[in-house]
């Protein structure tokens, strides 16, 4: 025994030493542990990855949220002697799902899980949330604990897209319903802003698992950080509370301790809530029949009756009142004057005019024959009434009338005297229980008893209060008609009726005794007597004078009978030949060559400018950030552009002519195209149907790779004009797509980029759009294109934008040349002399300057038979005496159109008097000093013939002085208020005679200043000035 006691300390020391030598192992999950399986599902699709620059910044915030959440997964001890422990894992997804790390025990695997999350590279493609949720469920069920009540998913997403493509794993609702069926709770956490709340609400198990949870926000504000921290704390607390109810239920608690001492009696409880409604009672006795119901509703409209007979024509209506004066409309913009049309054919003979008014009254005719005897005259009118006859005797009294109706009931009588007092009644029944009294004051607290054990799970609570009344339901249908009621009680007597009609007149009574009254007044005249016999006819009177002419009678009936055609007369003899008439005036010359070419251009349809043949390619961004609705609008835009080119620009999309194709793209190796070269497409109609059938891809954005695909597949070498129209949001994933965006740029291709805001309302990236459209490249590297930016996709379908796009596509039209070219065969110095007087006006002077610039451009760009022949132009403004601009010192002939146009634009309107003679002398001196002898000298003068103090003789002298200097004068006249004699002298230099042929080639007339800029007038003037 003593030996055993001595050996015991040695054995204990050996065991302790052996235990210290064993390697340390991770703590195993004890029986009393309560494990929780938590799995993160992270969205790294395009709508998240490419929303912020630099691309992937929002994904980094999602990863930061996940790592912060993992740091908050700490064990907890419950009072039921159980420990909450965590198992966590994560995956990320786009249109594919990748497991970051499976379920790992915390805290031992915390660092490894955080490192794996930090190493995630975003996919940046489509969004298959249903597949990701089902993959997360698989990880929870296969690798998790045995408690299915403690399994949670945290889905971090922006909810995009809302619609547009079929999710391949059964859809989002199917995945969420599967999670509910398996008992897995799903939290939905938003990536704000621009998240789709409806989709997030579908993902969450119920509204308590959604709330306003946020994983990442754009701003770095304090509020945003607090919202993210609050999201993590709220989710962790909800899980801990739920787990406590699961792991600390009554079945899982350890053995209970001994019962405690009986406590003091509690205070009287408050009055309980009303009990539940009792069972429905038996049906009561039937009530008495109701009163007669109200009049029923109007019945349904009957069928349409047969058509009635035609009514008689109504009377002619009165003339209506004069209407009120309407509101003055807005003045419309005056349109441009149209080109004069060709003379029309001779019209058909007109209809007969309206019959003229009746002529004046004719002279009275001769007396007619004696008339026949007239008929007897009409009866005469009644005579005056005769005197009144004597009054009649008094009649006998009449018989009594029938008895009257029963009178109304009388008023109630006064109350009678009080009766004798009755006997004392017996005791009444017991009354209802009174209301309880007010609660007494609270007593002093007793001594605190020992702390009791945790109570059991309480019973099921009483039902809650009934909810608020629902909304009023729709009006019910009309019920069946009730049975007729019983006959009512007799009503009170009605009011007295009106007095009856007077009775019949009684028979005449006997004559009474003679009266003794005074004689009455004479009676009224009696009624007229009968008509007397006709008297003897008088002697016949003399005939009266003829009456005035009566009014014209109504026109007789039309005579529709065709009169027989008369016999054709014999042909007459030919008359003698008349003398020869004098020669007519010389007619105006016919239209010149420029006007003839203009008429041909207007009349001939084959003269229209033709667009094409062209090779037209559309490249459509079909990524997730575009959205389904915007992609559908882009397809409609393509179809409308093709229709407009076919209809308005007469482009023929058929083999051997023009070609069209469409490419839609998303991420890497995800491109699709349809074109007229496809084997299944035979014509442009089938091409449009194929475009409408394209399905939205909803993936990432690899624009460079798509443009390379377009160049390789759809842009072979071709002699046609090649145009590529790229529609995108300008946010290509250039970090992973290394293909340059200017891959389409080449001298033979024109690229137009259209940037439009995406579903997140982000402004398109102008830097990428400029690169796509070949901006800033040398001509040898590529043809500069065009970059356009729009607010939204709906603007693509606006009429103005469609016109601009078709105009840009057909910018290189092939048009016939009807410009009426001019050629100079010798050197020429031309001066354009503008009228700057007050009668012209500032606005008209600006129009004249624009016309002068057109003429100058035609002169300076005209062809020359010899390149050594110089054509020089000067523009001068004149007004009163000594008022010519520019001054002589600065006036010179110019050959550079840009310099000349700048000088014309800088001219200020003088706005003073008019002195044509002084202006002619100024120009004549200028030609003598600045013009060479070999050059043709031409002067184009603007004038209305009115000049200050000028006479025909003075004008003739100034013009002849210019002609002696070799100057040929051409005159432009605007308007109708002109001095015609002075104009003729300015053109010919002669006051005696006027050469019409010479005048027609040197005088130009227009009705207004606006007409200077219409049509080909500037071509006509410049051609005649050049030919001389």
Swiss-Prot record:
GO terms for biological process: 2-oxoglutarate metabolic process; adipose tissue development; apoptotic nuclear changes; autophagy; basement membrane organization; bone development; bone mineralization; canonical Wnt signaling pathway. Residues 254-590 are annotated as: Disordered. Pfam families: Collagen (PF01391), VWA (PF00092). Prolines at the third position of the tripeptide repeating unit (G-X-Y) are hydroxylated in some or all of the chains. A motif (Cell attachment site) lies at residues 262-264, 442-444, 478-480. Collagen VI acts as a cell-binding protein. This is Collagen alpha-1(VI) chain. It comes from Homo sapiens.
């Amino acid at each position: 025994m003593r030996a055993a006691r001595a050996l015991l300390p040695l054995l204990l020391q050996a065991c302790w030493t052996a235990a210290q030598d064993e390697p340390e192992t991770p703590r195993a999950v004890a029986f009393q542990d309560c494990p929780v399986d938590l799995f993160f599902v992270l969205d790294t699709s395009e709508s998240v990855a490419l929303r912020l620059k630099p691309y992937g910044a929002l994904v980094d915030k999602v990863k930061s949220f996940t790592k912060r959440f993992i740091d908050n997964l700490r064990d907890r001890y419950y009072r039921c002697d159980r420990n909450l422990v965590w198992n966590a894992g994560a995956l990320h997804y786009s249109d594919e799902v990748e497991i970051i790390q499976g379920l790992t025990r915390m805290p031992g695997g915390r660092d490894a899980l955080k490192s794996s999350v930090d190493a995630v590279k975003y996919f940046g493609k489509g969004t298959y949330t249903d597949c990701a949720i089902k993959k997360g469920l698989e990880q929870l069920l296969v690798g998790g604990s045995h408690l299915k009540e403690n399994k949670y998913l945290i889905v971090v997403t922006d909810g995009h897209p809302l619609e547009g493509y079929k999710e391949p794993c059964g859809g989002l609702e199917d995945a969420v319903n599967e999670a509910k069926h398996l008992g897995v709770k799903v939290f939905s956490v938003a990536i704000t802003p621009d998240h789709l709340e409806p989709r997030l609400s579908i993902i969450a198990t119920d509204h308590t698992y959604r709330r306003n949870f946020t994983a990442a926000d754009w701003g770095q504000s304090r509020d945003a950080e607090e919202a993210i921290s609050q999201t993590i704390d709220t989710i962790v607390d909800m899980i801990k509370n739920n787990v406590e109810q699961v792991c600390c239920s009554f079945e899982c608690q350890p053995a209970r301790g001994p019962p405690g001492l009986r406590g003091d009696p509690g205070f009287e409880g408050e009055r309980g809530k009303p009990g539940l409604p009792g069972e429905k009672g038996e049906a009561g006795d039937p009530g008495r029949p109701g009163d007669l119901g109200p009049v029923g509703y109007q019945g349904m409209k009957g069928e349409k009756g047969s058509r009635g007979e035609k009514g008689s024509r109504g009377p002619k209506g009165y003339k209506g009142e004069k209407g009120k004066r309407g509101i003055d409309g807005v003045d419309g913009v005056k349109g441009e004057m149209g080109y004069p049309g060709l003379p029309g054919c001779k019209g058909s003979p007109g209809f007969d005019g309206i019959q003229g008014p009746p002529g004046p009254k004719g002279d009275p005719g001769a007396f007619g024959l004696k008339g026949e005897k007239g008929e007897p005259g009409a009866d005469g009118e009644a005579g005056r009434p005769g005197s009144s006859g004597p009054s009649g005797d008094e009649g006998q009294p009449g018989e009594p009338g029938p008895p009257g109706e029963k009178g109304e009931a009388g008023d109630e009588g006064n109350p009678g005297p009080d009766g004798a007092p009755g006997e004392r009644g017996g005791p009444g029944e017991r009354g209802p229980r009174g209301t309880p009294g007010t609660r007494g004051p609270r007593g002093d607290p007793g001594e605190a008893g020992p702390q009791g054990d945790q109570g059991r799970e309480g019973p099921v609570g009483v039902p809650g209060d009934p909810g608020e009344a629902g909304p009023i339901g729709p009006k019910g249908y009309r019920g069946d008609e009730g049975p007729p009621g019983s006959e009512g009680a007799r009503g009170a007597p009605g009011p007295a009726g009106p007095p009856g009609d007077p009775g019949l007149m009684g028979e005449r009574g006997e004559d009474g005794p003679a009266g003794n009254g005074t004689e009455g007044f004479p009676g009224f005249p009696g009624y007229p007597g009968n008509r007397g016999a006709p008297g003897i006819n008088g002697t016949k009177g003399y005939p009266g004078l003829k009456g005035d002419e009566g009014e014209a009678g109504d026109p007789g009936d039309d005579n529709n009978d065709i009169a027989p055609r008369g016999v054709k007369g014999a042909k007459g003899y030919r008359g003698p030949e008349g003398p020869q008439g004098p020669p007519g005036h010389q007619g105006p010359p016919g239209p010149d060559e420029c006007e003839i070419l203009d008429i041909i251009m207007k009349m001939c349809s084959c003269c229209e400018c033709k667009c094409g043949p062209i090779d037209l390619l559309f490249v459509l961004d079909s990524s997730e950030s575009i959205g389904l609705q915007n992609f559908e609008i882009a397809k409609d835009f393509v179809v409308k552009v093709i229709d407009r080119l076919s209809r308005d620009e007469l482009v023929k999309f058929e083999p051997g002519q023009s070609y069209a194709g469409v490419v839609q793209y998303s991420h890497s190796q995800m491109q699709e195209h349809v074109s007229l070269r496809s084997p299944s497409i035979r014509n442009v109609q089938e091409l449009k149907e194929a475009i409408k059938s394209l399905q939205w891809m909803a993936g990432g954005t690899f624009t460079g790779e798509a443009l390379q695909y377009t160049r390789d597949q759809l842009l072979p070498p071709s002699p046609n004009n090649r145009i590529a129209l790229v529609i995108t949001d300008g946010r290509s994933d250039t970090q992973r797509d290394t293909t340059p965006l200017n891959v389409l740029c080449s001298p033979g291709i024109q690229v137009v980029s259209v940037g439009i805001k995406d579903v997140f309302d982000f402004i398109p990236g102008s830097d990428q759009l400029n690169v796509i459209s070949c901006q800033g490249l040398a001509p040898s590297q590529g043809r500069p294109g065009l970059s356009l930016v729009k607010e939204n996709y709906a603007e693509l379908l606006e009429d103005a934008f469609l016109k601009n796009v078709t105009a840009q596509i057909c910018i290189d039209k092939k048009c016939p040349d009807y410009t009426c070219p001019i050629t100079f065969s010798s050197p020429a110095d031309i001066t354009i002399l503008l009228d700057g007087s007050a009668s012209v006006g500032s606005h008209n002077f600006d129009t004249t300057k624009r016309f002068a610039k057109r003429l100058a451009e035609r002169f300076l760009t005209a062809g020359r038979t010899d390149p050594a022949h110089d054509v020089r132009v000067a523009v001068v403004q004149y007004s009163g005496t000594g008022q010519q601009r520019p001054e002589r010192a600065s006036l010179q002939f110019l050959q550079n159109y840009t310099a000349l146009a700048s000088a014309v634009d800088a001219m200020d309107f003088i706005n003073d008097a008019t002195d044509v003679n002084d202006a002619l002398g100024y120009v004549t001196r200028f030609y003598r000093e600045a013009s060479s002898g070999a050059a043709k000298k031409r002067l184009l003068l603007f004038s209305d013939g009115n000049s200050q103090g000028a006479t025909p003789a003075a004008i003739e002298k100034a013009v002849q002085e210019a002609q002696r200097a070799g100057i040929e004068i051409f005159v432009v006249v605007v308007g109708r208020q002109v001095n015609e004699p002075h104009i003729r002298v300015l053109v010919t230099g002669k006051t005696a005679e006027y050469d019409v042929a010479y005048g027609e080639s040197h005088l130009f007339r227009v009705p207004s200043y606006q007409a200077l800029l219409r049509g080909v007038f500037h071509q006509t003037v410049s051609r005649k000035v050049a030919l001389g």
